[in-house]
Amino acid sequence: MVHIPSDVTPPRLCVVEKLNGENEYGYNLHAEKGRGQFVGTVDPDSPAERGGLITGDRIFAVNGHSIIGENHKKVVERIKANPNRCEMLVISEEGAKWYNENNVQITLDLPNIERVSPMSKETPVFVPPPPPPTDAMPYLPRLAELNKGTPDQEFGFNLHAERGRGHFIGTVDAGGIGEKAGLEAGQRIVGVNGQLIYPTTGHKEVVALIKKDTMKTTLLVASEDVDKYHKDHNIAYSWDNVERVDTRPVINVETHHHHEEVSVPKSNGYDVPPLNPHSIQVNEEREISKMTTTTRTETITNSNSAYQYKESSTAYDAYATPPVDSNDLMDEVFGRVNLPGVTMSSHTEVLPPTDDISSVSSLSSHRESAVDVPVSHQYVPSYATESHQKHEQHSQTHHHHHQHQQPSPLSNGSSHGYAASSTSGYDDDDIYHLSAREARERLRMKNRKHHLHEMSLNEKYQLVSNM
């Protein structure tokens, strides 16, 4: 690369753009043999003046192409290639002398080219590129490093050139080397393998730089926003301030979240606590046993009557009433009153009469004497006081002496075989005119006094049935 002293006048890259409604660039183009193409008169406040053209400037390149040795007609064609915009590399007559004397061609590859803002109306002054800023720039060109694995691979992108605008990245192959390096469609190439690229750089030259190494290439590319930022702030591109792309493989880490939902049933609008998922709910089926008790009712008549007994079965639920833990006989008897699900069954057996009254009497569990009771009448025992029991014992002795006589009617019209009470129509020991509660209380008291725990099973049944 040619070393150019800093005091040498640099060439200027002037961008001439027409604004809305403008039809001319506002300058004249002259050609002289031995001088080449140069700028004639420049109209004030014209696109040419705003672009930095000065009368007498020599023209060395137009829209990225060198015009050295080209005729006037060819140069005009290049200028008119874009009717609204034109880039020209120019230098003053005095400034060109040093290059002629030192045999240095003025081309777009010179390192000291100065870019002129299109909106500037002042004569441009060369300012060396500023040092890299300490703070990160908001817009940086991207450094894309493309490396092939084998010679038969492709970089995976297309190169497009637009006259007067530069070289751009076209289609980028998905998953290719170019995409992995960070290339995107629409980026402008501003550098190739360490060398800056300008809009005036020839297309063949850019292609040659890319193919310089068949296995790898390094591109400096700028998106539309980055390019606009550099133009607006008159910032030259540099290989020192770049955005690097991390080409290391990305490891995708997937995190699986397992959420187990346990539905909680509701009962009557209230939340039920959730069950342990490891617990087992067991529905215990309880078998209800049945217990059957048999109660025998005996009826004893005289020797001429048939001996009858009734046997009834009562079935009740063993779990309906808990067992009575009491030594009181009456509690055990009345503890089974009003049992649910009680079924009654009965049958009557008639036994043939016997001549031996003593054998008949021995079958009875009653302590009272036998009396004449009609067959259709149900015998219900009643219990009298101690004096009444003595009277019955006397009556029993009387019956033994007259067992062959005809039985006489019951006294006082009592159908139970006992005399009725002489006061208020009821005997004090008669419990059948009392309520069930009063009867139980009176019998409980009598049991304590007269040891009624010797009652037969028949008497207990009759007593319970009449409650």
Curated annotation (Swiss-Prot):
PTM (free text): Phosphorylated.
GO molecular function annotation: protein-membrane adaptor activity
Species of provenance: Caenorhabditis elegans
Reported phenotype of the disruption mutant: Viable, with no gross anatomy or growth defects observed. Localization of aat-6 at the intestinal apical cell membrane diminishes as animals age, and eventually aat-6 becomes diffusely dispersed in the cytoplasm. RNAi-mediated knockdown in a pept-1 (lg601) mutant background results in a reduced number of progeny.
The protein, known as: Na(+)/H(+) exchange regulatory cofactor-like protein nrfl-1
Region listing for Disordered, in residue ranges: 344-429
Primary site of residence: membrane
Gene3D superfamilies, alphabetized: 2.30.42.10
Assembly with partners or alone: Interacts (via PDZ 2 domain) with aat-6 (via PDZ-binding motif); the interaction sequesters aat-6 to the apical cell membrane of intestinal cells.
GO process annotations (BP): intracellular amino acid homeostasis; L-amino acid transport; protein localization to plasma membrane
Tissue occurrence: Expressed in the excretory canal and intestine. Expressed on the apical cell membrane of intestinal cells (at protein level).
Domain statement: The PDZ 2 domain is required for the interaction with the amino acid transporter protein aat-6.
UniProt xrefs under InterPro entries: NHER (IPR051067), PDZ (IPR001478), PDZ_6 (IPR041489), PDZ_sf (IPR036034)
Cell compartments where the protein resides: Cell projection, Microvillus membrane; Apical cell membrane
Function: Scaffold protein that connects plasma membrane proteins with members of the ezrin/moesin/radixin family and thereby helps to link them to the actin cytoskeleton and to regulate their surface expression. Anchors the amino acid transporter protein aat-6 to the apical cell membrane of intestinal cells, particularly in older animals, in order to maintain amino acid homeostasis. May play a role in promoting fertility.
Biased composition (Polar residues): 407-425
Keywords: Cell membrane, Cell projection, Membrane, Repeat
GO cellular component, one term: microvillus membrane
Domain PDZ: from-to ranges: 12-94, 143-225
PANTHER family: NA(+)_H(+) EXCHANGE REGULATORY COFACTOR-LIKE PROTEIN NRFL-1, PDZ DOMAIN CONTAINING PROTEIN
Gene encoding the protein: nrfl-1
PROSITE patterns: PDZ
Pfam families the record matches: PDZ_6
